[in-house]
Amino acid sequence: MNAIAIIAASGIGKRMQLKDGQCKQLLEIAGFPVIHHTIRAFQEASSVSTIYIATKEENIPALESMAASAGFGKVKAVIEGGKERQDSVNNCIKAIEHAIRTTGNTPDTILVHDGARPFIQPEEIDDISRLSLQFGACVPATRPKDTIKYIGSNPDFFGETPERSRLLQVQTPQGFQCGLLIQAHEQAELENWYATDDAALVERFFPEQPIKIYEMGYHNIKITTPEDIPVAEAIFNQRASWS
């Protein structure tokens, strides 16, 4: 198994209410930056050979230094991100394509992960890598705890309520066979078409491609709002007590 990981860490974190210049991926949980926990999981995943990170230009030196000092030897490059998350991932994909042309080595799968999800586990990464190779695409998800409702034609009122048993909340890392993800991003760039995640690109440009569900627990949270920090600390402490 040869998987390459892309970690998207370019978000400006508006909902975190951070001061200018601050980055949510560099906020600390248990004494280490959020992104440190994230990278470590991929460093320890046996299926992952190489890691690419996309971040804001001003954060590149800090992440390069952190990866070097922590011994994260799988980190091949820290790349400047783009305006949107999709642009950041695409920048990494272009770097991967260049490496393929240079070395002649094509990875089996590419995994795309949010840098602000620090609690993904190495064994989960390996499972998603394996299922991505087997089925072509695999995306982790959790069952929603709350009822979800559509907004009605009048945006001040609810519309219908979808059946909750048929809904899942999608997470990352999202895994794809290498050529599939590269082609999806190439086509999206040609059409200037944007989606909120990589699975949506595959759904649009390769509708015949099934995407395997990898159902997991509720630990794989994304650090998005200030309230997520104490929750993240609690998750870390609970997991530390299990070790």
Report residues per predicted region.
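Residue-level signal for inorganic ion chemistry
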Residues: 7, 35, 92, 114, ...
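Conserved beta-loop-beta/alpha segment of the NTase-like Rossmann-fold superfamily
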Residues: 83-152, 171
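Conserved alpha/beta core of the MobA/IspD/sugar-nucleotide pyrophosphorylase nucleotidyltransferase superfamily
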Residues: 168-243
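N-terminal glycine-rich phosphate-binding loop and ensuing alpha1 helix
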Residues: 1-61
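Residues at the starts of beta-strands that form the adenosine-phosphate
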Residues: 49-50, 136-137, 210
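Conserved N-terminal catalytic core of the sugar/cofactor nucleotidyltransferase
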Residues: 36-107, 189-191
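Short, flexible, basic/aromatic active-site loop/helix in glycosyltransferases
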Residues: 150-176
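Hydrophobic packing residues within well-ordered alpha-helices of enzyme cores
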Residues: 16, 63-67, 128, 148, ...
